[in-house]
C-alpha cells in the first residue's frame, strides 16, 4: 500500500518513475509514440489555423494578450459555428416564407440549366447577344428572330453596327469600348458602369423577312427600339481570359410602350443647295434616327412646300436663296404642310452660306429644315387646308403617304391606322403608283384614299373602304377618341385606310372649317362620321389633306379653298408627287383654282384614276367610281350645292366634291359659289364620264347609281343630303351603319358592284351615310386591281383586325361580315374591276391566282389599291387580321398543309368559320357545282361575295373567308351570318384559318388540279374566281366527300388546322383554336352549320363513324394540329390526305372529309395542302394545340366503333384502288366492304382487342427497340405500332397493290387493307390516341414492317391497310407509303386478321411473332430509314426508285417527326398532280431524301417540325 501511496502521493517519485520508463520506452523506436507525437503536432497546427480563421475575421485575436489556448480556440469555434447555424436557420425560415418552402435556394435547381436561359429571356422579353471589342456579334440567342426577324446564323459573326441604327452607333461604342480604352486602367474603376448599364438603341428589323415582303423600301429601314442591358466584363468571365474582357454582354428587349421616350417634338434634316438653289444633296439621317414612320413623306412634303408654296410671286425657297446669297444666312418664316396621315407640320428653314476655304468664294449653302409636328385639332383644319393643300395634293400621288394624305387630316383615323400604319405605309410605297393613283385621285377620293391607304397600310384601306369606316361608330368614336393619332408620325400610313375614316371626323372638322367653310363647320361633330366618310371620299379627311391628298380632296374639303390658293402649286406638287396622275388632272385645272379645283378634284381623281390610270384596271375602277361620283354630282347637283359644307364631307362622292367640297375653300361661300363651280364642274364631269365611261351601259348604270340609287344619299355623300345622312347615320350605331352599308354594298355589289364598281360606291355611300366614301372606295378598289385589291384588302382587313381589334370591336359584327364582305367585295371588286363582274373575273382569277400562288399578296396587298376599297366595302374588314390579309392569299400559299386543311375547314366548317358551314351545306364541299351554288346561295345571304353578304354575315364569313375568302368568299356570307358571333372571337382564329385556307388555296392553285375541280364553284362568286380556280378548288374536292366527313369528325380539326397554321399567326391560331374548341357547343354548332352531321350521315354512315372516330381527328386536323412536327401523327392525315390524298382520298373520301380530297387528284390538291404544310412546317409549332385538338378529336372519333373506322378505311382503300376519283364506286365498294368488314368487325374488334393487347406488348418491345434506335415511339404510337404489326404484315398484300398503282403503297394497301384499315382503327378505337398511334406507329410500324419484311412496299401495304384513313394518305402521298401505310398497317394489322379480305395480309401481319418481329425490326429499322429505302423501293415498286421508299421511310419518320412528312407532303403538293402522284411520290421520296435522313433522325426531326 505504501508503495501505492507513495506513488500516488509523491509526484516526484511518479515523475521519476515516468522518466525511468520513458528512456526505456524511447530506447527503441515506438510506432505508437511517434504516432501520438505526430497527432499532437497536427492538432496544434490545426488549432492554430482554427484560431487564425476564427479570430482573424473577427479581430478577436487581438483581444488576447497571450496566445489563446486550445480550449479558448475551440470554445470560440463552437460559438461561431452555432452563430452561423442560427443565421442559416433564420435565413431558411425567411426563405420558406418567400418560397413557401417549395424550393430551397440551395436545393437542386428544378429548372434545367439549358432551359433556364431561354426562360429568362422569355421573361425578359428579350434576346441575348455578345459583342466583342471589334463590334462583331460573337453570339446571339435564337429568339432574336422574334424581335429582328433575323435568324441566329444571319447575325453570328456579323458586325453589330449593321443592325444598329446609325444614330446609335456612338452610344453603343461608348458602352462597348470603355474596356478597350481602359488600356491597363484597373477595370474596377469602371465597375459601377460595367456592372449594369442600360441604354436604348434602334435595331434594324430584317427587311427581307417574309412579313416584310410586301413592305416598300421604307419597311426595309424599319427599326425596333430595343432597351439593352449591358454587362462589360463580369468577374466570372473576366478571370477566364482577355478575350472575354473585351466583350459586351447584352440582353436586348423591346422598350415597353409606356417606357418609350416621347419622340422629340422637333425633327430636322439638312439639304445642300448650289448657289442657284438647286438641291444637290439631302441628309435625312437625323430624321431616320427619329424612327418616325413616314419621314420620307415628311421630307418630300417639306421640300415641296418650301419650294412650291407661293409667297406673293416668289417661293420660300427662292426668297431664301436670295437672302442667303445676300446676307450669308437666312431664316424662313414658318410654313405649314400636312402629312399623308393628316398630321400638320410646322416648319422653318435656316440656311447658311458655305464659302471655299481657299478662295472665300461662296460655293453652296446648307439649309437646316426644322419640323414640328402639330397635334391635329379640328380648328386647325382651315389652317391646314392652306398649308397642306400645297403639299398634300402633290404628295398623295407621289407617295403612299400622299395617298393616305387624303384621309390624313383625320387624325382619329390615323390612330386606327397607326397599328398597321407603319407597315401599310411600306406596302403603299411598294406600289406608290397604284396607291397614289388611288389616294390622289379625287374621283374616288374616298376610294382613292382608301386604296392609296390600302397599299400603304394594308389594313387601313379596308377600314376606309369598309362600312365600319363610314359608320360613325368606327369613325367618329375612334377619330374623336384619338385625335392625336393624326399627329402621330406612325399614323400616316395607317391613316390611309382606317385612319382616313377615323380621321375623317377630324377631317370633317378641318374640312368643314377649312374647305367647307361654315357648312363643314356645321357638320362639325354632329356629322363627324359623315365628315369622316366625306373626308375619306375626298381622300383627305382634312381640308389640307384634301388639297394635298388629291384634287378630289381639295375640292371636297377645306383643302379646296387652299386649293384655290395653291391650286397650281398643288398641281405642280402633285405632278412630281402623283407621278403625273394627279398632276395631270390638277394641272389641267390649276388655273381655274376653285372651279377647276372642283372638276380637278373629280377629274383629278378620275384623271388620276381614269386619265392617268385609266388604262390601269385600277384606274378604270377609279374612273368608274369617279364616273359614279360625277354622275351623282350631276344628278344631285343642287343637293351638293345646297350643302356646301357637307359635300366636302360626303364630298367623298364626286357630287359632294363637285358641289360643296369641290369648292373646298369656297365651301364657306355656301351653295352659291359652290353651285356655280359645281355646275361648271358637273359639265366637265359629265363630259369626263362620257369620255371615260366604258360603255353607254356603264354610263347608264353609273347614272342610275348616281340618280336612281339614292341620289339623295349619294348626294348626301356629296351634298347637304350628306350632312343629314351623316348626322342621321351618325346617331345610329356604327355597327348598324356598317351593317346597313355592308348589306347594301353586299346586296348591291352583287348586282351593281360587278356591273358598275363605281356605281355601287355611291349607292353604298348613300346607304352608309357617313360611309359613302367607304363604299365608294370599295368600288374603286374593285376597279383597281382585281387581284391586288383582294389581296390588299385581305391584308388590310387582317392587319386592321389584328392590330386594331378595339377599333373594330364596334364594327366587329359588321366587320365580320366585313371579312366576308372583304372577300365578297374583293371578289365583287374583282368583278367590278372589269367594270363588269364577268369582265374582271378572268383577270381577277388570274391575278388572284398569280398573287396567291406567288404569294405576292403581301406585297401586292399594299400595292394593290384595288384591294383597299374592297376592304372598305367590307366595312373596314378589320375582321381580317393582318395575317389573314397578308396570308389570305399569300397565306394560302404560305400556309402549311394545315392551311389546306384549314381551308377545307373554313369552307367545310364555315359554321365555325363563316365560310365553312355554308360551303359544306351548300354542297361546296360536296361538289364543285354545289359549291358555287353554295357560295352564291349558301353565301347567298352574303349575296354577292363581297357586297351581297349581309354585313354581319359577310363580315364574319369574310373574316374567315376573306383569306379563304377569295376562295369561298361567297360561301362565307351565309355561314357568316350564322357565325357573326364567332367572327368577333374569331378574328384571331379566323385569320389563321384564312391563312390556312389561303395556304390551301395556294397549294391548290399550285396543284391546279384541285383548283380546277372547284374553279366553277368559285367562279360564280367572281371574287373567288381568281383564286377559286386554284385556291377554292383545292378545298372543294376534299369538301365534296371529305368535307362532311372531315368536318363531321373534325370540326375541331378544321380549327386545328388554323392552329397548325400557327407559323403565320400562331398566336391567332391558338386563340382561334382555343375559342373554337373551348366550348363543345361551339364545335357542335360548327358541325351543324357545316352540315357535317347530315353530310356524314348521307355520305358514309359507316365511313362517317369511322371518320368521326378516327379519321377526322386523326386525318383531318388532329394529325395536322396534333403533329406539327410529327406531321404524321398530327399531319400524316393531312399530309397523306394533302400530300397524297388520291389514295387516301378515295378511302378517306368517306372516312375523312378533309382527307377525302379523294377525287383522285383532289388528293394532289391535298398535296397542295401538304405543300402548304411544308411551307407550314413552321406552323407545326402549334403542335401542342394540334396535339390537344387531335387528341380531343381522336378521343371522340376513337370512341366511335372501330368498325366504322375500319369501314372507312376499307372505303378509302377501295377508292384508292379504283383511283380516288371514282368516289361513287369507291363509296359503293367501301360500303360493301365496310358492311362485310362490319360483319366481321365485331369479331375482328374483339380479336383486335386481344391482338392489340398482344401488339401493345409487342409494341412496347418495338418501342423499346425503336427508342434504342432513337425513334422514340409515344405510347400512342406504340399502341398503334402494336396494331401496326398486322398492318405491317398486311403491307405485303397491299404491297402488290401498291406496286400496281401509281400510289400503290397506299392504294394497294387501301384495296387490300380497307377492312383491316377500318378494323385496325377499330382496335385503335379503344385508344383515344390510336389515330396518333397509328400515325406514329404507321411511321414506325412501316419501318418495322420494312425491317421485318425488308420492304417499304410491304410497309406501305401494311400501312395502307392499317392506317388507310389517316396514314394511307400519307402512304399514298409518299412513294414509300410506309408512313401512311404504317398507320393503315396498324389498323389493318389488328383488324385485318379477321377481315376475310385482309386475312392473307393479316396472316403474317397479325401473327404475334410477325407483329413483334415487324414491330421490333420496324422500329429498329426506322432509325435506318435510309437503309430501308431499299426495302421501300421494293415495296414501292410502283415507285421504282429507292427514293420513294426512302420517302416512305421518311414519311414514316416524318409522320412521326412531322418534318419529313411536311417536306414530303409539300413535295407532293408541289407536284400538284394526282397523276403525278406516283412520280410525285418517288419525287417526294427523292425530295425527302433529306427527309429520309430526317426520318432516321426521328425524334430529332420532330424538333425541326
From Swiss-Prot:
Protein task: Transcriptional coactivator for steroid receptors and nuclear receptors. Coactivator of the steroid binding domain (AF-2) but not of the modulating N-terminal domain (AF-1). Has a role in primitive myelopoiesis in the differentiation of granulocytes and macrophages. May play a role in the positive regulation of the circadian clock.
InterPro entries hit by this protein: bHLH_dom, bHLH_NCOA1-3, HLH_DNA-bd_sf, NCO_DUF1518, NCOA2/3_DUF4927, NCOA2_bHLH, Nuc_rcpt_coact, Nuc_rcpt_coact_Ncoa-typ
Region (Disordered): 1-41, 392-515, 542-562, 578-676, 835-871, 939-962, 1246-1265, 1277-1334, 1372-1436, 1475-1505
Modified residue annotations for Phosphoserine: 695
Gene Ontology terms: biological process: cellular response to hormone stimulus; chordate embryonic development; granulocyte differentiation; myeloid cell differentiation; positive regulation of transcription by RNA polymerase II; primitive hemopoiesis; regulation of DNA-templated transcription; regulation of lipid metabolic process
Similarity comment text for this entry: Belongs to the SRC/p160 nuclear receptor coactivator family.
Tissue and organ expression note: Expressed ubiquitously in the embryo and in many adult tissues including the brain, gills, liver, swim bladder and skin. Shows highest expression in the ovary and testis, and lower expression in the intestine, eye and skin. Only isoform E20b is expressed in the muscle and heart.
Polar residues compositional bias, start-end: 1-11, 396-424, 444-457, 580-590, 835-857, 1372-1384, 1408-1436
Motif (LLXXLXXXL motif): 1069-1077
Biased composition (Basic and acidic residues): 12-23
Domain notes: Contains 3 Leu-Xaa-Xaa-Leu-Leu (LXXLL) motifs. The LXXLL motifs are essential for the association with nuclear receptors and are, at least in part, functionally redundant.
GO molecular function: nuclear receptor binding; nuclear thyroid hormone receptor binding; protein dimerization activity; transcription coactivator activity
Domain (PAS) ranges: 113-183
Keywords: Activator, Biological rhythms, Developmental protein, Nucleus, Phosphoprotein, Receptor, Repeat, Transcription, Transcription regulation
PANTHER family for this protein: NUCLEAR RECEPTOR COACTIVATOR (PTHR10684), NUCLEAR RECEPTOR COACTIVATOR 2 (PTHR10684:SF2)
The protein, known as: Nuclear receptor coactivator 2
Short motif (LXXLL motif 2): ranges: 686-690
Pfam families from the UniProt entry: bHLH_NCOA (PF23172), DUF1518 (PF07469), DUF4927 (PF16279), NCOA_u2 (PF16665), Nuc_rec_co-act (PF08815), PAS (PF00989), PAS_11 (PF14598), SRC-1 (PF08832)
Compartments (UniProt record): Nucleus
Amino acid at each position: 500500500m505504501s508503495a501505492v501511496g507513495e506513488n500516488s502521493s509523491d509526484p516526484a517519485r511518479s515523475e521519476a518513475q515516468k522518466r525511468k520508463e520513458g528512456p526505456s520506452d524511447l530506447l527503441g523506436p515506438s510506432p505508437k509514440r511517434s504516432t501520438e507525437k505526430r497527432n499532437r503536432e497536427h492538432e496544434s497546427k490545426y488549432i492554430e489555423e482554427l484560431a487564425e480563421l476564427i479570430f482573424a475575421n473577427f479581430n478577436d485575436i487581438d483581444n488576447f494578450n497571450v496566445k489563446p489556448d486550445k480550449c479558448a480556440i475551440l470554445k470560440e469555434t463552437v460559438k461561431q459555428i452555432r452563430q452561423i447555424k442560427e443565421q442559416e436557420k433564420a435565413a431558411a425560415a425567411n426563405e420558406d416564407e418567400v418560397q413557401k418552402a417549395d424550393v430551397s435556394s440551395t436545393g437542386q435547381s428544378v429548372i434545367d440549366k439549358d432551359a433556364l436561359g431561354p426562360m429568362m429571356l422569355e421573361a425578359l422579353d428579350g434576346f441575348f447577344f455578345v459583342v466583342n471589342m471589334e463590334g462583331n456579334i460573337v453570339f446571339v440567342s435564337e429568339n432574336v428572330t422574334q424581335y429582328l426577324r433575323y435568324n441566329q446564323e444571319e447575325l453570328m459573326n456579323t458586325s453589330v453596327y449593321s443592325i444598329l441604327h446609325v444614330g446609335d452607333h456612338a452610344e453603343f461604342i461608348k458602352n462597348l469600348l470603355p474596356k478597350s480604352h481602359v488600356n491597363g486602367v484597373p477595370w474596377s474603376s469602371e465597375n459601377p458602369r460595367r456592372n449594369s448599364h442600360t441604354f436604348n438603341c434602334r435595331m434594324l428589323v430584317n427587311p427581307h423577312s417574309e412579313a416584310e415582303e410586301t413592305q416598300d423600301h421604307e419597311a426595309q429601314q424599319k427599326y425596333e427600339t430595343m432597351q439593352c442591358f449591358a454587362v462589360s466584363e463580369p468577374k466570372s468571365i473576366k478571370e477566364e481570359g482577355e478575350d472575354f474582357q473585351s466583350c459586351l454582354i447584352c440582353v436586348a428587349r423591346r422598350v415597353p410602350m409606356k417606357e418609350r421616350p416621347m419622340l422629340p417634338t422637333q425633327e430636322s434634316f439638312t439639304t445642300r443647295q448650289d448657289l442657284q438653289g438647286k438641291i444637290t444633296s439631302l441628309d435625312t439621317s437625323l430624321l431616320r434616327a427619329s424612327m418616325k414612320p413616314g419621314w420620307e413623306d415628311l421630307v418630300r412634303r417639306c421640300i415641296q412646300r418650301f419650294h412650291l408654296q407661293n409667297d406673293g410671286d416668289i417661293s420660300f425657297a427662292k426668297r431664301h436663296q436670295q437672302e442667303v446669297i445676300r446676307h450669308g444666312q437666312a431664316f424662313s418664316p414658318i410654313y405649314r404642310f400636312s402629312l399623308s396621315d393628316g398630321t400638320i407640320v410646322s416648319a422653318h428653314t435656316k440656311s447658311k452660306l458655305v464659302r471655299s476655304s481657299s478662295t472665300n468664294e461662296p460655293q453652296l449653302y446648307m439649309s437646316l429644315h426644322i419640323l414640328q409636328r402639330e397635334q391635329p385639332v379640328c380648328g386647325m383644319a382651315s389652317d391646314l387646308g392652306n398649308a397642306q393643300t400645297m403639299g398634300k395634293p402633290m404628295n398623295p400621288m407621289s407617295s403612299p403617304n400622299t395617298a393616305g394624305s387624303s384621309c390624313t387630316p383625320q387624325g382619329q383615323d390615323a390612330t386606327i391606322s397607326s397599328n398597321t400604319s407603319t407597315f401599310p405605309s411600306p406596302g403603299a410605297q411598294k406600289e406608290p403608283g397604284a396607291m397614289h393613283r388611288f389616294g390622289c385621285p379625287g374621283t374616288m377620293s374616298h376610294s382613292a384614299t382608301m386604296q392609296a391607304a390600302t397599299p400603304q397600310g394594308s389594313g387601313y384601306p379596308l377600314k376606309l373602304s369598309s362600312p365600319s369606316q363610314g359608320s360613325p361608330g368606327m369613325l367618329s368614336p375612334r377619330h374623336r377618341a384619338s385625335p392625336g393619332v393624326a399627329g402621330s408620325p406612325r399614323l400616316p400610313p395607317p391613316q390611309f385606310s382606317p385612319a382616313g375614316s377615323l380621321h375623317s371626323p377630324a377631317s370633317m372638322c378641318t374640312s368643314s372649317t377649312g374647305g367647307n367653310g361654315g357648312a363643314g363647320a356645321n357638320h362639325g361633330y354632329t356629322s363627324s362620321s359623315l365628315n369622316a366618310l366625306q373626308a375619306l371620299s375626298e381622300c383627305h379627311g382634312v381640308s389640307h389633306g384634301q388639297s394635298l391628298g388629291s384634287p378630289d380632296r381639295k375640292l371636297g374639303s377645306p383643302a379646296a379653298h387652299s386649293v384655290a390658293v395653291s391650286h397650281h402649286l398643288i398641281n405642280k406638287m402633285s405632278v412630281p408627287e402623283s407621278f403625273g396622275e394627279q398632276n395631270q388632272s390638277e394641272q389641267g385645272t390649276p388655273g381655274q383654282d376653285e372651279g377647276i379645283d372642283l372638276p380637278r378634284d373629280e377629274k383629278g381623281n378620275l384623271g388620276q384614276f381614269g386619265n392617268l390610270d385609266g388604262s390601269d384596271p385600277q384606274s378604270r375602277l377609279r374612273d368608274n367610281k369617279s364616273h359614279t361620283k360625277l354622275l351623282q354630282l350631276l344628278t344631285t347637283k343642287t343637293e351638293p350645292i345646297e350643302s356646301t359644307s357637307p359635300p366636302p364631307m360626303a364630298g367623298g362622292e364626286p357630287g359632294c366634291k363637285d358641289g360643296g367640297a369641290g369648292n373646298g375653300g369656297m365651301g364657306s361661300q355656301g351653295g352659291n359659289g359652290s353651285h356655280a363651280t359645281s355646275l361648271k364642274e358637273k359639265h366637265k364631269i359629265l363630259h369626263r364620264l362620257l369620255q371615260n365611261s366604258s360603255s353607254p351601259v356603264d354610263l347608264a348604270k353609273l347614272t342610275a347609281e348616281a340618280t336612281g340609287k339614292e341620289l339623295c344619299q349619294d348626294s348626301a355623300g356629296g351634298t347637304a343630303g350628306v350632312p343629314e345622312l351623316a348626322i342621321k347615320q351618325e346617331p345610329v350605331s356604327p355597327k348598324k351603319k356598317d351593317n346597313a352599308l355592308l348589306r347594301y354594298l353586299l346586296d348591291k355589289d352583287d348586282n351593281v358592284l360587278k356591273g358598275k364598281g363605281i356605281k355601287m360606291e355611291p349607292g353604298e355611300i348613300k346607304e352608309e351615310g357617313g360611309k359613302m366614301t367607304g363604299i365608294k372606295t370599295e368600288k374603286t378598289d374593285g376597279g383597281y386591281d382585281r387581284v391586288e385589291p383582294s389581296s390588299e384588302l385581305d391584308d388590310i382587313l387582317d392587319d386592321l383586325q389584328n392590330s386594331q381589334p378595339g377599333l373594330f370591336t364596334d364594327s366587329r359584327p359588321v366587320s365580320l361580315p366585313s371579312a366576308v364582305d372583304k372577300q365578297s367585295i374583293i371578289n365583287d371588286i374583282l368583278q367590278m374591276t372589269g367594270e363588269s363582274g364577268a369582265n374582271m373575273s378572268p383577270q381577277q382569277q388570274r391575278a388572284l391566282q398569280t398573287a396567291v400562288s406567288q404569294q405576292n399578296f403581301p406585297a401586292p396587298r399594299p400595292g394593290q389599291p384595288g384591294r383597299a376599297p374592297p376592304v372598305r366595302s367590307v366595312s373596314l374588314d378589320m375582321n381580317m387580321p393582318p395575317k389573314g390579309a397578308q396570308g389570305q392569299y399569300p397565306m394560302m400559299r404560305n400556309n402549311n398543309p394545315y392551311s389546306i386543311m384549314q381551308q377545307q375547314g373554313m369552307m367545310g366548317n364555315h359554321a365555325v368559320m363563316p365560310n365553312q358551314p355554308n360551303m359544306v351545306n351548300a354542297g361546296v364541299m360536296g361538289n364543285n357545282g354545289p359549291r358555287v351554288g353554295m357560295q352564291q346561295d349558301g353565301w347567298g345571304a352574303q349575296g354577292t361575295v363581297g357586297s351581297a353578304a349581309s354585313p354581319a354575315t359577310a363580315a364574319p364569313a369574310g373574316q374567315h373567308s376573306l383569306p379563304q375568302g377569295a376562295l369561298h368568299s361567297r360561301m362565307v356570307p351565309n355561314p357568316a351570318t350564322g357565325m357573326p358571333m364567332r367572327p368577333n372571337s374569331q378574328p384571331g382564329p379566323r385569320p389563321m384559318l384564312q391563312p390556312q385556307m389561303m395556304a390551301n388555296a395556294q397549294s391548290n392553285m399550285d396543284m391546279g388540279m384541285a383548283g380546277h375541280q372547284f374553279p366553277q364553284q368559285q367562279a360564280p362568286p367572281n371574287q373567288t374566281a381568281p383564286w377559286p380556280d386554284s385556291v377554292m378548288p383545292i378545298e372543294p374536292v376534299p369538301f365534296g366527300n371529305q368535307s362532311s366527313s372531315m368536318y363531321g369528325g373534325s370540326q375541331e380539326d378544321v380549327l386545328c388546322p388554323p392552329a397548325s397554321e400557327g407559323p403565320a399567326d400562331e398566336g391567332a391560331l391558338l386563340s382561334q383554336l382555343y375559342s373554337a374548341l373551348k366550348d363543345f357547343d361551339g364545335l357542335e354548332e360548327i358541325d351543324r352549320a357545316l352540315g357535317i352531321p347530315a353530310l356524314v350521315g348521307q355520305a358514309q354512315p359507316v365511313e362517317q363513324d369511322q371518320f368521326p372516330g378516327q379519321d377526322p381527328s386523326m386525318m383531318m386536323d388532329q394529325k395536322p394540329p396534333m403533329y406539327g412536327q410529327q406531321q404524321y401523327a398530327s399531319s400524316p392525315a393531312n399530309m397523306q390526305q394533302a400530300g397524297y390524298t388520291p389514295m387516301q382520298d378515295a378511302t378517306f373520301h368517306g372516312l375523312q372529309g378533309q382527307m377525302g380530297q379523294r377525287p383522285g387528284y383532289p388528293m394532289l390538291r391535298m398535296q397542295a395542302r401538304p405543300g402548304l404544310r411544308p411551307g407550314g412546317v413552321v406552323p407545326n409549332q402549334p403542335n401542342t394545340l394540334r396535339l390537344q385538338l387531335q387528341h380531343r378529336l381522336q378521343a371522340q372519333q376513337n370512341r366511335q366503333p372501330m368498325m366504322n373506322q375500319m369501314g372507312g378505311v376499307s372505303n378509302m382503300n377501295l377508292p384508292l384502288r379504283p383511283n380516288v376519283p371514282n368516289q361513287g364506286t369507291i363509296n359503293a365498294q367501301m360500303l360493301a366492304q365496310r358492311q362485310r368488314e362490319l360483319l366481321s368487325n365485331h369479331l375482328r374488334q374483339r380479336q383486335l382487342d386481344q391482338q392489340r393487347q398482344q401488339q401493345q406488348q409487342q409494341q412496347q418491345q418495338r418501342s423499346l427497340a425503336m427508342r434504342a434506335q432513337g425513334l422514340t415511339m409515344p405510347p400512342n404510337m406504340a399502341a398503334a405500332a402494336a396494331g401496326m404489326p398486322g398492318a405491317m404484315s398486311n403491307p405485303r398484300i397491299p404491297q402488290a397493290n401498291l406496286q400496281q398503282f401509281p400510289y400503290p403503297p397506299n392504294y394497294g394497301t387501301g384495296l387490300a387493307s380497307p377492312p383491316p384499315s377500318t378494323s385496325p382503327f377499330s382496335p385503335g378505337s379503344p385508344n383515344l390516341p390510336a389515330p396518333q398511334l397509328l400515325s406514329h406507329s404507321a411511321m414506325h410500324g412501316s419501318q418495322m414492317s420494312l425491317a421485318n419484311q425488308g420492304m417499304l412496299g410491304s410497309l406501305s401495304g401494311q400501312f395502307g391497310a392499317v392506317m388507310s384513313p389517316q396514314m394511307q394518305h400519307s402512304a399514298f402521298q409518299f412513294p414509300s407509303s410506309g408512313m401512311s401505310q404504317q398507320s393503315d398497317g396498324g389498323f389493318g394489322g389488328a383488324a385485318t386478321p379477321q377481315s376475310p379480305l385482309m386475312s392473307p395480309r393479316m396472316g403474317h401481319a397479325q401473327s404475334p411473332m410477325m407483329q413483334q418481329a415487324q414491330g421490333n425490326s420496324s422500329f429498329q429499322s426506322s432509325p435506318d430509314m435510309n437503309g430501308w429505302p431499299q426495302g421501300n423501293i421494293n415495296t414501292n415498286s410502283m415507285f421504282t426508285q429507292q427514293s420513294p421508299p426512302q420517302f416512305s421511310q421518311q414519311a414514316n419518320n416524318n409522320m412521326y417527326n412531322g418534318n419529313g412528312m411536311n417536306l414530303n407532303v409539300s413535295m407532293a403538293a408541289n407536284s400538284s398532280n394526282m397523276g403525278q402522284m406516283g412520280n410525285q411520290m418517288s419525287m417526294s421520296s427523292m425530295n425527302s431524301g433529306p427527309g429520309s435522313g430526317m426520318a432516321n433522325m426521328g425524334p430529332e426531326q420532330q424538333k425541326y417540325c
